[in-house]
Amino acid sequence: MNESKSVASNELTSGKVERTTLKLSDKLKISSNIQQGNKFSLNKSITTVEVRKSKKRKNIDEAARSSLLLQNNDIDGNSEDKNSLTIQEQISRMNALQNASNNEKREELSSDSNKHIEEEVISVKAEVEQSVDVVLPNDNLLIESDSSEKVIVDPVTDSEHGDKDFQDVVMLDEFVSSNLDDAGDQKNGDQSDDISDLLEHKGIEGKKLKKYEKEHEEKKGNPKKVMSNNTYTKHVKLVIEEELEEDNNKQVIKNYRSKKNRVTNRSVKNKITRKVLIPNKITVQELANSMSERVKDVQQVLYQMTGKHDIKLTDYLDSDQASIIVEAFNHTFKLVDNAKLENDLYSDGNNMELIPRAPVVTVMGHVDHGKTSLLDAIRESNVVDGEFKGITQHIGAYQITLNGDKKITFIDTPGHEAFAAMRAHGTNVTDIVVLVVAADDGIMPQTIESINHVKAANVAMIVAVNKIDKHDADLDRITNALLQHGVVAESLGGDVIVVPVSAKEKINLDQLKSSILLIADLLELKAVYNTRASGTVIESKVDKNCGVVATLIVQKGTLKVGDIIVAGNQAYGRVRSMFNADGGSEKVAIPSMPIKVFGLNNVPNFGTSFIVVDSEKQARELINYRQDLLNVELSKQPAVDKSNILLYDMVDELNVILKCDVMGSIEAICYSIGKITHKDIRVNILYKGVGNITKSDVLLAETSNSIILAFNVKTDTQVKELAKQKNIEIKHYFVIYDIIDDIKKILTGMLKPLKQEVQIGTLSVRKVFSVGNNGSVLGCYVTSGLVKKGALVKLVRNNNIIHEGKIKVLRRFKDDVKEVTAGFECGILLDYSKEIYPESDVMNIFEIVEEIRVIQ
């Protein structure tokens, strides 16, 4: 820089300090009132040591004396040239004055202090490992070292050095500097050599030397004032701050690496070796969790094994792959075959003693043929009055006792079409089927369906012809109709027992009971009692007071209160209590006994199997295994055709939230809704569940624009108010038929009507009155049918339709009319501006007719 700014500070005799911003090229005028004896008061500052090569060493004392003499001459002078000095000259003279002052202090030092300094320097030298460039304060010293380089102390060179020159600088106090300089002037060359050797090392620490100086000052009784930090120049401060920041960053990095190494070493040292249980199938996520390892690490090992990049968390691994991965992470494993576990559970007790059990009888037939009434007559109960409109909506299980010790278990299934799946499940747990046929109605669709279920399940069947008391009852007609479906009665030479009964008049009920016991004896029904219990879920629901309630049929073993059961792939729990069909408490349940169980964590699906396990841990393992099997089956399903998805999205939807009292009702309603199909509209069941309507159901309906269908469940007042605020419709039903009928009506209202063109007449053009931009005015004759204002017109020329439009105006003479029939002339305004040929052009008249579509 040619020009730089600096601040010159002079301490006047009055004690005030005047500061002026000047340039290096400016001249300074020195006041003549300054006495010769006055010395410039300088703030002590830290100076830099610059290593320069020179041929000889300047005598510091002579330079100081000559500088002082020059200053005195300049101060005494009165001319303008003598009193005008540049800033650089003034700074040099101030340095000379300071050096002279330092020389006076050096002379005051005693030989004892020199000896002490020598001892201090020798002790520090022993600790120094590396040489360093040294900064000495306030003295222009030139100290020779063993090398060709010489150290020059210059207090004004801080602006001439770069950052690199300051990296190896050590700050020393002025007192140490003066003592070192004085020690260099001693005749004894040994001390000078020691100082020179000291300066060759870069390991001298300023703090240690400062400590030695402080101790020396305390011994002298004249402690030196410690320089304040504000005496540093701006450049030196900046360099020091940068160096401190860099050292701090290095220390932070060093601490971080040291901590990381400690953590790594500790983690490796304290890594736990786990024993991993490996089933037949396990996902990547599950394997990583069982090892407590990161998923990406497991994926990396899999990539090395298979070379596949697209490894998902839900991908399944077989036991061989999983075991290799476990060993790669230094864990141990144990193969667990959950399929074997389940097989062992169900095979337990196969070789035990078989004991006779009660028959399980399922009553099936068409709706309203008297199935529940017949059971009421047999049980001497009145269940049918509890059913809405006398139609059974739920599957029921009961047990009756005959002749003191003979027991029969009855399962009552709903008869209408919606419960086809329930009837199918009923045949899986039954031993004997009682097919109820009304004597007046005969064979109905659900009767035929029940016959097919019996044949598929290969179970014994008894036909009970009910309502035999009616005048139009015809038993022979019923037996002949059954023959057409492969059911041969004993009267016709077959093996199927046909019993005419009347539930209302209680006719032949004992004969029906005896027939059931006879077939049961022929079947020799037996089961193992002394083993873990297993069976089938007949029905399940949520009770607001007791929680989940499941109706079970025990098929094997003995179920006790306190047992842990697993039902299906989602429900398990400890049996808290059990009740029979009459509401009585039970402690144990033996084979063929229907029982209501409390204590499951979830609502199991009806028709699923249950089994008792040893612990809740084993129950969870079995649940997870069954869910994995389900996921594997779902993953094997073919990909959905994207073109079908686009078509599917174009279909209108009716969103439905379904809440029912029991799981069987949900399955029945979903089955019936699934049979409602149409190419332009469909029903989307967003959510289905067991229990009363809740606020969450209302909020979901609001979000999804759905209707809520409630079957045999209640809605409390708060939920009703919320639904009213949100304008959500809640429909309550007690018969499944009503739900299906309402859904069909709603879908019918959502369907857009079909528009069809129906030809209603024909016109022949007699005369063209005008043709313009506003249309053509034509004189026409109605040859057939009629013409209506606004009707669709198709202009035909040579059997080609050249124009389609509407009749804007229809007149008869000068009067506007709505229609003109055949055999009359009329005038029309047609929205067609091109040429029309009366001889060859014909106009066909059409009417748009909308056809209302109905969901059947």
Curated annotation (Swiss-Prot):
Keyword annotations: Cytoplasm, GTP-binding, Initiation factor, Nucleotide-binding, Protein biosynthesis
Region (G2): 390-394
SUPFAM superfamilies for this protein: Initiation factor IF2/eIF5b, domain 3, P-loop containing nucleoside triphosphate hydrolases, Translation proteins
UniProt-annotated location(s): Cytoplasm
Domain of life of the native organism: Bacteria
Residue ranges annotated for the tr-type G domain, each copy included: 356-526
Chain intervals for the UniProt region annotation (G3): 412-415
Single GO cellular component term: cytoplasm
Binding-site residues, GTP: 365-372, 412-416, 466-469
Region (G4) residue spans: 466-469
Gene3D superfamilies with a match to the protein in the record: P-loop containing nucleotide triphosphate hydrolases (3.40.50.300), Translation factors (2.40.30.10), Translation initiation factor IF- 2, domain 3 (3.40.50.10050)
Keyword Protein biosynthesis assigned: yes
Main location: cytoplasm
Similarity section: Belongs to the TRAFAC class translation factor GTPase superfamily. Classic translation factor GTPase family. IF-2 subfamily.
NCBIfam families per UniProt: IF-2, small_GTP
The protein's name: Translation initiation factor IF-2
Organism annotation: Ehrlichia ruminantium (strain Welgevonden)
